[in-house]
Design a protein with these regions (language model features):
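Domain-scale recognition of functional cores that engage charged ligands
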Residues: 1-13
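C-terminal catalytic/substrate-binding lobe primarily of soluble NAD(P)-dependent oxidoreductases
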Residues: 17-177
Length: 177
């Protein structure tokens, strides 16, 4: 996995690449507002932070044994928390089981179901198209918030949707069953 700072850096680099491909001829942003405006100009609506754990064991998973390649407690904690994601201003609907937070930056929604029970379609270079668990990861919210454009009154007029889609190693998926 990659930590939130590295992911944020990669999103910025990807944005610069997209802006160059679109020939936006924009200078490299220096402020949060400039980064958010460039994201808006590029027309980006969604950011997927996708991870696929491809590690595998030489021996089969034993029955009644929980297997994971990193912290079992951390994995279970992420898996039982409600799914949470940055919610874009272009989204004109919300899932029936979605809720908004009463406090905070206003960039996120959460679903009334655990992340380990929520699948999203995404893409990883190692496997291509895949389904991942929509688990809570702070960078999903901090990135959506960072790239929010607000009007003079402080109302969000642009924000990309951002979520983290995690596909654990196959033995960890079996352990969840």
């Amino acid at each position: 996995g990659a930590n939130p700072d590295l992911v944020s850096f990669l999103v910025k680099q990807a944005l610069l690449n997209v802006a160059a491909d679109l020939k936006l001829n924009a200078p490299t942003p220096q402020t949060k507002a400039e980064w958010a405006d460039l994201m808006r100009q590029a027309g980006i609506k969604g950011i997927h932070i996708a991870e696929r754990d491809t590690q595998r064991s030489k021996s089969p998973k034993e029955p009644d044994v929980f297997v994971n390649t990193w912290s079992v407690e951390g994995f279970l904690s992420e898996g039982v928390q409600p799914s949470e994601l940055g919610w874009g201003t272009h989204e004109k609907w919300m899932p029936e089981n979605a809720r908004t937070h009463q406090a905070g930056c206003g960039a996120a929604i959460y679903l009334m179901q655990p992340g380990a029970n929520t699948r999203v379609r995404t893409w990883c270079p190692t496997r291509g198209a895949q389904y991942g668990f929509l688990v809570t990861h702070n960078e999903s919210i901090s990135i959506a918030d960072y790239f929010t454009v607000r009007d003079a009154a402080g109302t969000a007029v642009y924000r990309p949707t951002c979520h983290y889609a995690y596909h654990p190693c196959n033995d960890a998926v079996l352990s969840l069953h």
